[in-house]
């Protein structure tokens, strides 16, 4: 009986002393195909290869939620401003004169960040004017 325990102890000692048996030696290897992988929806002659998953940029859920919140708050603030302007009786011409002068070139006006606000207010004004017209007549 003692011989079995001695033999077992010797085998365990050999296993521990041998690094190849218990220690896991893993070498990471990159696999590179010898050809370009194409999407099944593209023709084989199309030079646009399919993008790898690692190269696609994705927002985290927190960043997406924060971005959505910032956009919705900006729109809510803009809609409140438009509502106040509309109730004060300001027309799109009044808003145009607030942001731009009559002597400005149309290219300069179109490149201004205020042009977007002016054009969105024009849409808001026309939509609400159409809805309010039958109430006031």
Curated annotation (Swiss-Prot):
This protein's record includes keyword Signal: yes
Short motif (RxLR-dEER): ranges: 48-66
Induction: Expression is induced during host plant infection.
Subcellular location per the Swiss-Prot or TrEMBL entry: Secreted; Host cell
Signal sequence extent: 1-23
Keywords annotated in UniProt: Glycoprotein, Secreted, Signal, Virulence
Sugar-bearing residue positions: 79, 131
The UniProt record lists the keyword Ligase: no
Superkingdom of origin: Eukaryota
Major place of residence: secreted
Any one cellular-component term (Gene Ontology): host cell
Domain notes: The RxLR-dEER motif acts to carry the protein into the host cell cytoplasm through binding to cell surface phosphatidylinositol-3-phosphate.
Sequence similarity: Belongs to the RxLR effector family.
Function: Effector that is involved in host plant infection. Contributes to virulence during the early infection stage, by inhibiting plant defense responses induced by both PAMP-triggered immunity (PTI) and effector-triggered immunity (ETI).
UniProt-recorded name of the protein: RxLR effector protein CRE17
Organism listed in the record: Phytophthora infestans (strain T30-4)
Lineage per the UniProt record: Eukaryota, Sar, Stramenopiles, Oomycota, Peronosporales
């Amino acid at each position: 009986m003692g011989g079995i325990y001695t033999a077992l102890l010797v085998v365990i000692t050999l296993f521990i002393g041998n690094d190849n048996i218990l220690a896991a030696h893993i070498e990471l290897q990159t696999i590179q195909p010898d050809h370009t992988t194409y999407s099944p929806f593209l023709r084989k002659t199309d030079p646009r290869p399919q993008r790898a998953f690692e190269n696609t940029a994705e927002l985290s859920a927190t960043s997406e939620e924060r971005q959505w919140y910032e956009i919705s708050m900006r729109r809510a603030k803009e809609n409140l401003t438009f509502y106040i302007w509309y109730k004060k009786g300001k027309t799109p011409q009044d808003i145009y004169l607030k942001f731009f002068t009559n002597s400005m070139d149309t290219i300069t006006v179109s490149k201004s960040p205020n042009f977007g606000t002016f054009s969105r207010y024009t849409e808001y004004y026309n939509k609400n004017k159409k809805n309010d017209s039958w109430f006031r007549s």
